């Protein structure tokens, strides 16, 4: 690590015009659990890192405290500068020490945080950095109720920041210190202001330069001004004529840079952003730059089977690839924000994003989501402000999630939700707030947008009952700006001989999930009452609290290898670039009944279905959904679907065959089971 820092120092000396330097702190960490009492047997790890990587459902999951140690040689030449250490994600509570001195704590596992360590450093010497990390549940650190795994660890990158005494602040809510506010956006002109946060070593003024560079590299705005430093943020107005507006179809990105210095630049920070307007109305739906965009969104959680929660760029690229193949144009960061890399890519790809704050209730009846204490409420407010400040400049982020699926019993949570909603608007007036609700009452009237979490027909009633609910919503609450989200679990290893069979806590067949999505898609797709449709979830995710250690509501398995039938349903409905033809239930190749019926998804027109040499009659059931009546088959039969150039097929064994034994995981006797 010493050699690594020293090498970067040489590069910094050569680049004398760039005073700020940023050094990765991902290498050279020693990791050991607090229960081990000493670091004698510490493991050498590289960030991102988590101590929980078992997502296979064995139930082995640690909620504990661990230590991360690193040694840094800090050159004597840096003694006239300032040093900051930044962590992009530590789950969930971090206490930071330098050379044995306490630096500070961060309570919240999804946002970045920065500490200044200048006065703790021994310049020209080795310095010991210690981060004590806990992923234990706390009643004053949100979320206090969730079924997703909180894996623990320093699960995102870390870095050392070197600046002059006066600099753009790395300390403002873990952000870059620059918020690019858009006050007025049109095809003719963008007007806004750059809000700049500064730190100073005693100077009372400095010269700031604001430059804005267009997507083609041309400078479209520049302003230089002498600024008084008084502890308040500095605001520099700007305007851009004939802007290229950011949209899903044209994700144009501008570069906004702020530099400090007169003849010599002593600090410089640049951020990317895009200029666009966002409006949502009951009649006009969700519009970007005045054009309505029906949102086809998926909920995205925070892990996979290989990396656990310590996701890296290739993990995000793979997930975005599948999301784009599905045809979704939006994603929801469930419960908490993802890494900056994901939102950078959404900016570039034109993907719309809903970012949740971690105020969430799971479906476990014993959970408490809201503790009516000052500590809890302050933590929720702090995390929300950090989320907004750190993601403010991303044009892809179009709404802030305030809460998800909270109950209205017990302490009245609505006054606190009102405070959170007001705080979001105070920090960012340009974006709407949103909530996901499965409750009645005043809780649904707090945020600008409301997304109804609906599951009628999953355990009670029938899936067609959702149309009754929809009609009641339109009759009584059409003035609300409503979206809808839905989903249900389906494990590819669980097979049912009827899609109507009710799911159980430890048995949720894929066929049931498929049926649920088919009926909801039939009844709700392209319904103008809703500004957006959100599918829960894009991928299965780790949940040690559930049977098999996995929440199986994804359209794709947690290892990303198997796409469930429902994936192809939405691909047929949403992906207009790549046609779809898919026969459902192909994993059930052994059929014991001679009477068989088939479902086919096609976006390439009505398919032809062959059973051996025989053509089966196909009828259109709903948009992109086709079905056959039950037909008599026996023996080994190849089923082939044809639609234009597309082909899909499956070979079945039909008749008196042995049913495969149902594979079950270890029986659980603890933890109440959720309702979905």
Where are these regions (language model features)?
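Accessory carbohydrate-binding/adhesion or oligomerization-edge regions at the termini
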Residues: 19-56, 132, 138, 159-160, ...
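Accessory beta-strand-rich segments of carbohydrate-active enzymes
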Residues: 23-25, 30-36, 58-59, 63-171, ...
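Active-site-adjacent substrate/metal-binding segments within catalytic domains
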Residues: 48-74, 78-87, 91-98, 104-107, ...
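Short strand-edge motifs at loop-to-beta-strand transitions and within beta-strands
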Residues: 68-70, 111-115, 232-238, 624-627
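Extended acidic/polar, glycine-enriched regions
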Residues: 122-124, 195-281
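Beta-strand-rich binding/interaction modules
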Residues: 189-226, 234, 595-616, 636-642
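Substrate-binding/catalytic cleft of secreted carbohydrate-active enzymes
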Residues: 320-322, 330-562, 566, 570, ...
